[in-house]
Amino acid sequence: MDFFQYFFRYYWQLVYMICLMLYITMYILIYNFTGKTLQTVKYFLYPSCTAMLIAMTMAFATQTRNIDNTHSMALLCDGFCKYIGPTFCFYCYNLYTAFGIVVNLINLHTMYYRTLCLKYLDAKKVRLWTLVFMWHYLCPLIYLIVIITSPQRHLEVSMETLSLHPNFDYTPYLTFGGFSQAQKELLDKAAMSLSLISMYYPLIGTYWKHKAMKMLKSHMSPNTSDATRAMLQTLIKGLNFQILLPMLRYIPLTAIYFMIKYTGEQFLISQYTITVLGTIPCILDPLVQIYFIRDAIRKFLACNSSPVRRIYDSWASRMII
């Protein structure tokens, strides 16, 4: 085993334990500190936290090392999935990819909902357009269905990998497979789509952030408390930061993808980075949510404890409830 194999074997155990503690903390905060007045928040926080937990669990289950071949891409898995077989590892890897996209969509969906709450006074119209956004979730679902239902040829992938990279130590990975030639073509198209998504998420998220901040300044009552103003602005900025987090994954992955295509060579460290880079948002995202949930709830409850302020803050509080 080389240095990277030893390093990432311990890396995954440490990172997964940290993430588990963060997600447990998130569930406790959501359950105990978001009551009836903050009911709508749960509709976004629970799915977001669950999707992150699933994505991180699938990443831990695979602990994938990606080998880019001429006609295929091998998945050398060092997680517990390797004891079940290459087909199970293949499913876990694609679930990790799909739920990683879902997390990003939920964050974008949350920002969209906040903007709608400021734009429309009619709650029915807000719910309608919030539901319309849900067609975005068809994208990871279609990707998952297409890639999983396509023919799997793990033996061919394994044979090509062994012939092209005979010097690698394959003993820790047991029996492995990966994406066949047809699946690799789909994967290449998906990589191109991710490069476009890496621009779409921050652009549309930043647009909605500026739109929401502008409406906050123009619509908010002069009698609205300073705490409510600060809380709403901080909440929107926090959501925008969450939307930008995936760029920590997509930009390096896109750069690595084009570098491999241009040079025709894959550096050793790049074989480990595809799955590892996905763990960065999984760690930072719950940290951001934990911070802003506690801060937003504390300020919201402080504002609503005053009967004088409550009347003037009712419009602004729609951003949360």
Swiss-Prot record:
Compartment list: Membrane
Give the bilayer topology: Multi-pass membrane protein
Q: What is this protein called?
A: Serpentine receptor class delta-63
The alphabetized UniProt keywords are:
Membrane, Transmembrane, Transmembrane helix
Gene that this sequence comes from? srd-63
Specify the superkingdom: Eukaryota
Pull one GO CC term from this UniProt entry: membrane
Ranges annotated as spanning the membrane? 14-34, 41-61, 83-103, 128-148, 190-208, 240-260, 273-293
Coiled-coil ranges per the record? none
The entry sums up its family as follows: Belongs to the nematode receptor-like protein srd family.
PANTHER family assigned: SERPENTINE RECEPTOR, CLASS D (DELTA)-RELATED, SERPENTINE RECEPTOR, CLASS D DELTA
